[in-house]
A protein has these predicted regions:
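A short, charged helix-loop
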Residues: 1-18
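Alpha-helical interface subdomain recognition
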Residues: 16-153
Length: 153
């Protein structure tokens, strides 16, 4: 049974690839939320100088910056999913990919930094999550290429 031929088959294939990219971005954004939550919990429980380290202003500001990055990535992921078969869907997907690259890398790196040395150990799930975030970043492909496509309009 032939499902589609010619240009219709090519369009269906492009849509399937775009849907897979949206799925990978969504996986990364969801996992990044888990990493942020685990990091926030660690900052609430880890104590230094008689208080939770999350009370230190510099660390609170870093977490706020990461929350903003996550929200931007999540919003663009939703937009890409909703515009998957729209005329400007490919451009929105490229924007979502670029933002996902930026957010996943920053959230992963900061989570390890905020956890300190223990963040790199297999004892904490965060280390495994961060490895998956980096793998998703590679699976998505080059952010510079997506940015160039986006800029070309």
């Amino acid at each position: 049974m032939v499902v589609a031929q010619g240009e219709a088959a090519v369009d269906a294939w492009r849509l399937a690839l775009a849907a897979a990219r949206v799925g990978r971005i969504a996986e990364g954004v969801g996992l990044a939320r888990t990493v942020l939550d685990a990091t926030a919990e660690y900052l609430r429980t880890r104590r230094q100088f008689g208080q939770p380290i999350g009370r230190f202003q510099a660390l609170a500001h870093r977490m706020a910056d990461l929350a903003i990055l996550h929200e931007q990535a999540q919003s663009l992921a939703w937009a890409a999913a909703m515009k998957l078969d729209a005329a400007d869907g490919a451009r929105t997907l490229d924007a979502a990919q670029v933002m996902a690259h930026r957010a996943l890398r920053a959230i992963g790196q900061e989570a390890i930094q905020l956890h300190g040395g223990i963040g790199m150990t297999d004892e904490l799930a965060v280390s495994h999550y961060v490895k998956r975030l980096l793998a998703i970043e590679v699976e998505l492909g080059d952010a510079d290429t997506a940015l160039a496509r986006f800029a070309a309009g």
